[in-house]
Amino acid sequence: MKSRSLLSKAVVSSLLLFQVLSVSASDLTSDIQEVIKGKKAQVGVAVLYKDDAFTANNDDQYPLMSVFKFHIALAVLKKMEKEGIPLTAVVTLGPSDIDTKTWSPMYKKYKSKKITLSYGDLINYMVSQSDNNACNWLINFVGGIQNVNDFIKNLGIDRIQLIETEKSMEQDIRKSYNNWSTPLSVTQLLRKVYTEKVLSDEHFAFLEKAMLASASGKDKFRAGLPKD
């Protein structure tokens, strides 16, 4: 399916697939260590190629920050599939759902504490623009962040923890480090979504499009990929 072939481009920052794995693990480790040498950063790498996996610094717990919005989107779309809720179904966010001080392109556009829009638009705001109000509402929609955590682990992704929402992290920035994953767990999840029927074709294509539309990723790994 053409849309599935595009996802490998969208998620290449975590899922590095080589057509030919021509370098040894030791060579790759040396190259990575050379790149990060002298940098004040904690860097972890996971590479999957067919049935082989290579990792560097994978034992540490890396804060997911807004990357957890991908995990939330998966849980939301799966719940919508089970309940027969179309992407075009409309919901209304009220004053209790809108934090005017958090990052929210949605609120910036509508300038209202009562916003009516579709599930699809909400997911787009969360995934493509990292909207925190949309994120918090969608977490509540699936029954809380623990349900997102359980959903991901039921997919076979073990080394991950999701216990905070954007709201709780806004209240205490130190909690931003409580949502974590290893590089390999993120990579395994991305490959599972890419190669298995985690989502319906409609929802897979929708999520892929939302990821490709992410404004914050255009100048990162994606910038070095072929246009086609």
Enumerate the predicted regions with their spans:
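Active-site SXXK
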Residues: 63-93, 126
